[in-house]
Amino acid sequence: MQRPTPHHNNRRSDRLDLTYCDRPERPLNCATAMPSLTLKYAYFPGCVAQGACGELYQSTAALTKALGIELLELKKASCCGSGTFKEDSRLLEDTVNARNIALAEQLNLPLLTHCSTCQGVIGHVDERLKDFQTSDPAYLNQINGLLQKQNCSPYQGTTEVKHLLWALVTDYGLDELQKRVTRKLSGLKCAAFYGCYLLRAQKTIPYDDPYQPESMENVFRTVGATPVYYPGRTQCCGWPLSSYATDQAFQMAGNHLDEAIAAGADCLVTPCPLCHLNLDSRQPEVAKFMGHKLDLPVLHLPQLVALALGIPPKALGLDRHVVSTRSVLEKLGL
């Protein structure tokens, strides 16, 4: 059964409610494992992982708990807008996400997200506002004035916006991750689908090459899987077109799936839930549009890593996908 697609509320700034700024944060999980590193983040799950892609929220919780990473969920955070707020107002996008970042700053923690779109949008806003501290302080004062009217903390530019992928690779470290592997994913051929927001929404990405990335492939190798390369792994999935140019969105998704299948992939793995919606949830429609069978499982990054840590598939929501993940599990003897 197909999952509902997410939608955004009216983007008019006069309907934006930022007034619930006094609710306490709550820990999503506590660090029960004892790795050599102790990591703690202000966790921004985004709206898709709490709705249409609930298995991403579920698997992130399972993975971080197993690794001993503590997440303090930002329950007061707003949807980042996934790039749509700026169509109405750049000030709206900047103010909403300045507030999201300020919530993490209050905790003196990096803001962690498992959504490439959230990373791209919030990370880009953070980059812009840090520049404005010297290049356009009046604009930044305008944003902080709007936040003050809603009894919200000001943006200070004192933290970092970081995707879960980069936290695993650069903070936790692949050597540490390898020590936690209890079930090597030997023989599983994984094709990374980075998409566009993670790599190119910001001017500077210190963790990977925006055009020839390797961070996901390095994670695959660490957990015993085999990386598969194909041309479209860093291109847009087509999701932004899905509401007004459906055929083009289906064509883009179909091309990527065809390329991964032709390269011998057993599954696609993505760090973005919106990419997952277009490549998994809509894959039956994409296959119908393309005129041929696809049936390529699409996993969220934390699901794949968590499998290698011995976490049961059901605890990772692998039964929630539109395209069955059974072929992946059978290949792993599960």
Regions found by a protein language model. Give the residues of each.
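Residue-level detector of alpha-helical hydrophobic segments embedded in or interacting with membranes
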Residues: M1, T19-D22, K40
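Cationic, low-complexity basic patches in intrinsically disordered or flexible, solvent-exposed regions
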Residues: R3, R26
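Intrinsic-disorder-associated, low-complexity terminal segments enriched in Asp/Asn/His/Tyr and depleted
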Residues: H7-N10, D14-D22, N29
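Iron-sulfur cluster-binding electron-transfer modules in prokaryotic oxidoreductases
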Residues: L28-L334
